[in-house]
């Protein structure tokens, strides 16, 4: 009772500890939950949309790496449904329209770009998403299509695309007739061929077309097309299949990805957008038996590996929507197309489209998803509403400054680089308008100038780097050049950047060389030889793509992807490459030694996605290996304590789920460490001997990057799909790491407290009453934060002892008055 009075008007975190607890049990940390601060204004990649035909206010939206979301208000507000499932990547969502509480979900997006994530199979709910059952296909990785039989809810066809990064038999079309208990493979070509598209005849659920697609991705090359690609037809609900050929009017030779669509009002009309030696749109007027080419303009199918879908107006077989970089529409059966949506205008819609839904009863009502979220029109494209409250931004990197309150910053997939507050003294939460875009393109590292965080550095694809002024908006390009103009610089899609902790004017940047600037990017010098393997077989990005070239620099390889500068001793540099090298310089770049080859147990050519020098020991560093690009999803994190002579593995698949992406060690308590993987956040309080997944308030998320704001002792988390998070005040974890879990056996323990500030929150900027459609990130609670633990057994024993002794002494009356007030009933007697 005394403790309750102590904490009046304070923000209190309570950790209730059973006496027998010896491990870091997440159930005990309910009061320590990270805050999702957003942003949502740029949203993120949406992969699938479906709505209930009889009540289209009920919408399900799948995202590339941000989970599954549901709206029951026509897209005004949204609920995340997959926070606790072991996957966050959604390939397809399909509603059983005869019973909309039944929803099927295929995990793993079907757009195999370089940043594609993956899932773990097939899911189903029978209660509208409250609970989910995993049905199998664990190794399918990417499920792209689901067709439900409208006459039998137990019958479904599952179109598995399969992983881009490897060759497996877990591909093709699967069929179930018992609601998913048994999944039979009914169409299989080879280990490289999966589903590109699959559609059903609206007049005959037994008539199905499946476009099989052979493709393969390597870190340095992508190939679309092969002998396995082709169009297949079934007339018995997918039990048996027949391949259509050039004898039926399809193009000759090697084929790639195809998009398919039936016309609902005229089911004999079918369209196929086909990648071939000459990409073209084909049409059938007899339900798919015979085909003819109707449009082979150069732009009709410009980037099929990333988007190749077509849709037909349900009331007009000649009105076709083609989704690609922009959405285009044809009114003449595909003979000609025009851009349908506004582009880079003030009312523009984000490019790169992947999901499309047209109401079958109202063709004016359309929803589409792209790399920047969801847009909705109710007048067939005359006007659009952008859904600005889906916090599914895909951060590649995260960082913080030291302003007061401090800011969080980072770059995102196809959505630029942004800076926004970690918390603020305003009502209304952290709104999208409080975030400032400081660079466009695909954003990567963002780093504040330690001398003045008004300025900073922002990276984008192709090695682009700029120095920005966030007050004026001015930005200047500072990309380094090689002194020899004949030397071509190879920059990774996500090139390495680092600041020197010993000199605020010195920065480093990685191509195949390490570039150093001592004047904040005004000039550069090369301080290393080529630190990669320089394998010419991995330098074919300019011809990447297969049937359709796609030379965007996304496959740049034999490059530097991580640079770590020791904060302990000046001049110690660690460098990681995308082809497996770890290079060490102990003299500021004068000489280099390759030390990664001494690591045993990790595959050659793995990416060293991060390399973190120890804040305590100059000879120590931690290397985070990411080998998923060789279809290996295990975590690999290695530590050296002797300049790379020997290495020890810090995690394995029994402790940590998913390939590792990020690591950070607390700069004050060496026993406290965090690891981010493709599927979550893990914490260790014993220097990596044991890891615990952080589940309190944190979803399954690709945890790309981690930062610690040292003044306020916050862990800041950048996710690739769920925006940014802040775990406020990790001092309790520091104390547990320093003293062990035995600390929690005390009856009551009060942890070190952060500084509290008395502040009066001012009104939010802009709209005061925001309703539900305007996003608001979680602000830090007001008041003083005190975290304490209670061991119920010890506390009750101490309380009993205290009560037994109360009759043996008097006090000044305050305690007795408190007890009287608490008891209450005695006064009435």
Where are these regions (language model features)?
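Long, acidic low-complexity intrinsically disordered regions
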Residues: 802-828
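Short amphipathic, basic-aromatic surface patches that mediate peripheral association
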Residues: 786-807
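Bacterial N-terminal signal peptides
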Residues: 7-16
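Generic low-polarity alpha-helical segments
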Residues: 1, 16, 428-430, 497, ...
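Beta-propeller blade termini and top-face loops
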Residues: 22-774, 781-782, 791-793
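Sec/Tat signal peptide C-region and signal peptidase I cleavage site
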Residues: 17-21
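Intrinsically disordered, low-complexity acidic Ser/Thr-rich regulatory segments
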Residues: 551-560, 819-829
């Amino acid at each position: 009772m005394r403790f309750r009075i102590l904490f009046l008007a304070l923000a209190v975190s309570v950790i209730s500890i059973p006496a027998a607890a010896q491990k870091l049990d997440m159930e005990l940390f309910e009061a320590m939950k990270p805050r999702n601060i957003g942003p949502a204004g740029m949203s993120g990649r949406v992969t699938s949309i479906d709505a209930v035909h009889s009540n289209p206010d009920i919408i399900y939206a799948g995202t590339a790496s941000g989970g599954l979301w549901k709206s029951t208000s026509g897209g005004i507000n949204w609920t995340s449904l997959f926070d606790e499932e072991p996957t966050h990547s959604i390939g397809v969502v399909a509603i059983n329209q005869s019973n909309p509480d039944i929803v099927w979900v295929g995990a793993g997006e079907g757009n195999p770009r370089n940043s594609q994530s993956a899932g773990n199979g097939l899911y189903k709910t029978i209660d509208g998403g409250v609970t989910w059952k995993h049905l199998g296909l664990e190794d399918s990785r990417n499920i792209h299509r689901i067709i439900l039989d409208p006459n039998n809810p137990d019958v479904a066809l599952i179109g598995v695309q399969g992983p881009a990064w490897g060759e497996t038999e877990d591909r093709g079309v699967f069929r179930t007739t018992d609601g998913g208990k048994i999944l039979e493979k009914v169409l299989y070509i080879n280990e490289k061929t999966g589903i590109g598209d699959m559609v059903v005849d609206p007049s005959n659920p037994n008539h199905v077309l499946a476009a099989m697609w052979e493709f393969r991705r390597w870190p340095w090359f992508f190939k679309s097309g092969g002998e396995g690609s082709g169009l297949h037809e079934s007339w018995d609900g997918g039990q048996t299949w027949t391949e259509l050929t050039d004898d039926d009017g399809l193009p000759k030779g090697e084929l790639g990805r195809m998009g398919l669509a039936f016309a609902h009002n005229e089911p004999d009309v079918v369209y196929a957008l086909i990648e071939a030696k000459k990409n073209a749109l084909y049409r059938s007027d007899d339900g798919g038996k015979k085909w003819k080419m109707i449009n082979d303009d150069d732009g009709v199918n410009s980037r099929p590996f990333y988007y190749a879908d077509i849709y037909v107006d349900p009331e007009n077989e000649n009105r076709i929507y083609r989704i690609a970089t922009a959405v285009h529409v044809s009114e003449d059966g595909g003979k000609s197309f025009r851009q349908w949506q506004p582009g880079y205008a003030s009312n523009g819609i984000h490019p790169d489209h992947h999901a499309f839904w047209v109401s079958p009863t109202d063709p004016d009502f359309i929803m589409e998803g792209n790399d920047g979220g969801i847009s909705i029109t109710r007048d067939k494209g005359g006007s659009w509403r952008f859904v600005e409250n889906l916090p599914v931004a895909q951060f590649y990197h995260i960082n913080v400054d030291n302003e007061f309150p401090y800011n969080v910053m980072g770059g995102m997939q196809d959505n630029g680089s942004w800076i926004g507050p970690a918390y603020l003294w305003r009502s209304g939460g952290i709104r999208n308008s409080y975030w400032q875009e400081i660079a466009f393109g695909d954003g990567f590292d963002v780093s504040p100038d330690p001398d003045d965080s008004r300025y900073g550095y922002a990276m984008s694809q192709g090695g682009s780097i700029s120095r920005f002024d966030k007050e004026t908006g001015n930005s200047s390009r500072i990309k380094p050049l090689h002194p020899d103009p004949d030397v071509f610089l190879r920059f990774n899609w996500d090139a390495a950047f680092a600041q020197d902790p010993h000199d605020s004017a010195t920065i480093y940047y990685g191509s195949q060389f390490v570039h150093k600037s001592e004047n904040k990017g005004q000039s550069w010098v090369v301080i290393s030889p080529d630190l990669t393997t320089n394998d010419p077989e991995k330098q074919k990005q300019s011809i990447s793509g297969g049937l359709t070239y796609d030379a965007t620099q996304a496959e740049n390889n034999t490059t530097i992807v991580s640079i770590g500068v020791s904060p302990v001793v000046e001049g110690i540099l660690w460098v990681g490459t995308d082809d497996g090298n770890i290079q060490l310089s102990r003299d500021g770049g004068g000489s280099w030694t390759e030390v990664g080859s001494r690591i045993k147990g990790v595959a050659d050519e793995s990416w060293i996605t991060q390399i973190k020098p120890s804040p305590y020991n100059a000879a120590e560093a931690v290397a985070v290996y990411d080998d998923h690009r060789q279809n290996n999803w295990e975590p690999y994190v290695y530590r050296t304590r002797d300049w790379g002579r020997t290495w020890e593995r810090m995690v394995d698949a029994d402790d940590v789920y998913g390939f590792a992406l990020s690591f950070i060690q607390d700069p004050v308590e060496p026993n406290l460490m965090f690891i981010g993987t493709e599927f979550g956040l893990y914490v260790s309080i014993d220097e990596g001997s044991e890891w615990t997944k952080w589940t309190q308030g944190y979803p399954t998320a690709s945890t790309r990057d981690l930062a610690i704001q040292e003044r306020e002792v916050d862990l800041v988390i950048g996710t690739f799909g769920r925006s940014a998070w802040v775990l406020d005040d990790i001092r309790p974890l520091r104390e547990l790491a320093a003293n062990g879990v035995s600390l929690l056996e005390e009856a009551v323990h009060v942890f070190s407290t952060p500084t509290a500030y008395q502040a009066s929150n001012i009104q939010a900027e802009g709209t005061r009453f925001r309703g539900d459609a305007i996003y608001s990130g979680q602000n830090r609670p007001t008041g003083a934060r005190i975290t304490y633990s209670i061991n119920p057994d010890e506390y009750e024993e101490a309380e009993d002892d205290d009560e037994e002794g109360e009759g043996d002494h008097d006090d000044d009356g305050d305690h007795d008055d408190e007890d009287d007030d608490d008891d209450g009933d005695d006064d009435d007697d």
